[in-house]
Amino acid sequence: MDPSKYRPSSAYDTPFLTTNAGGPVYNNVSSLTVGPRGPVLLEDYYLIEKLATFDREKIPERVVHARGASAKGFFEVTHDISHLTCADFLRAPGAQTPVICRFSTVVHERGSPESIRDIRGFAVKFYTREGNFDLVGNNVPVFFNRDAKSFPDTIRALKPNPKSHIQENWRILDFFSFLPESLHTFAFFYDDVCLPTDYRHMEGFGVHAYQLINKEGKAHYVKFHWKPTCGVKSMSEEEAIRVGGTNHSHATKDLYDSIAAGNYPEWKLFIQTMDPEDVDKFDFDPLDVTKTWPEDLLPLIPVGRLVLNRNIDNFFAENEQLAFNPGHIVPGIYYSEDKLLQTRIFAYADTQRHRIGPNYMQLPVNAPKCGHHNNHRDGAMNMTHRDEEVDYLPSRFDPCRPAEQYPIPACVLNGRRTNCVIPKENNFKQAGERYRSWESDRQDRYITKWVESLSDPRVTHEIRSIWISYLSQADKSCGQKVASRLTVKPTM
């Protein structure tokens, strides 16, 4: 018998109830007891199996991005960028690749309202002919900290108080007062974009710089941008409260219902590219994840379109067990030296092994759709049928060989081991430029959010003064307006 033919699937459902082992179950209502009143007998195997399965049917939720929704579709190349990359899925206009996307909030639990102020996750898994490419981003182009040593503390500060389980402004502002580079992300976090109307009406960003490599081996740094064809829409604070009180899953419902109705969400993919020789020509470090690249100097280049035209079949299998990893790249795309990206390559795979298990890549939603082969073996819940006699390489009895080498960036590294910050921090300029780009009513909403947060009674005078200093260094009038509404004298 083919051991993989009857792999558990609803396609092989019987017309009657069975145990996990396939034995028939004739009573699904009454436990087996001594007489009509009990006690219950341990030999009621199906009862024990049913309860034990129920006790274990949930897996640990994601430590971040726990609340989310997924959908399937395709990515289609619309513009030729083969001069920039040898990635097969970007080979020519018209090339299509199946994808699955997951949108999420970042901080709160799996059942939390989707209307809360938060950064949103925007992750895309491309099932290419050369393996999976995971572009794991957010709806804002920057992040709070540039070094992963601060990442666990960043998330803890944003999450609820471990004593009361209440998210509190004083904790957030206390921690980030030590990270002035976070101000640029706060210019998004306290802005309208972190109250998106739904998932369909928000942008997406790869956040980090990656590298594109062409067939000649020439590399360019690249940033990825998703632009929704239906436009960007946000809610006011009042709308968010009303929507959250009406339906805590409003964004999931909107995504699901839109696809079911044939109103398929679509995003255009754009890239910015930079020659590595130009990295030192800017007044900031282009590989600093707290910075954006100026579009007037590095314009957006159109690449393709993302269309979500299929709802997932099972929420647990294709959303909860769906696993992304920035380490999953394909030939023609490579990592940059971005410190946060470098550590995410490890952390994402590690958290999936903890959350789902060591063989999480064997799950259908995570497995590549192309042929693949290695000697990673066994482990808990291994589902792969393997009949090889050789489980090592190299071997004269196994024809498997290393793949042909593909171009990767040529990079000569040399330097002293050190723990230090980057030379060009420039923490406030871009936050100020963003603030000044807004209309006055949008500026006022941003200031109001700062005043509300800094008015937390546990925010000390010292913390308020630090933040007013940061805001003033970004934009003097912004700092003055916040200070005047708090009756605190600005230090700059």
Curated annotation (Swiss-Prot):
Top EC class of this enzyme: oxidoreductase
Q: Where is the active site?
A: 65, 138
Q: What is its main location?
A: other
Alphabetized UniProt keyword annotations? Glyoxysome, Heme, Hydrogen peroxide, Iron, Metal-binding, Oxidoreductase, Peroxidase, Peroxisome
The Gene Ontology terms for molecular function here are: catalase activity; heme binding; metal ion binding
Which GO BP terms sit in this record? hydrogen peroxide catabolic process; response to hydrogen peroxide
Keyword tRNA processing set for record: no
From the Swiss-Prot or TrEMBL record, state where the protein is found.
Peroxisome; Glyoxysome
The coenzyme or cofactor needed here is: heme
Q: Which reaction does it catalyse?
A: 2 H2O2 = O2 + 2 H2O
GO annotations of cellular component type: cytoplasm; glyoxysome; peroxisome; plasma membrane
The EC number(s) attached to this protein equal 1.11.1.6
List residues binding heme: 348
Subunit structure, as described in the record: Homotetramer.
What is this protein's function per UniProt? Occurs in almost all aerobically respiring organisms and serves to protect cells from the toxic effects of hydrogen peroxide.
Family the UniProt entry places it in: Belongs to the catalase family.
Q: What is this protein called?
A: Catalase isozyme 2
To which species is this protein native? Solanum tuberosum (Potato)
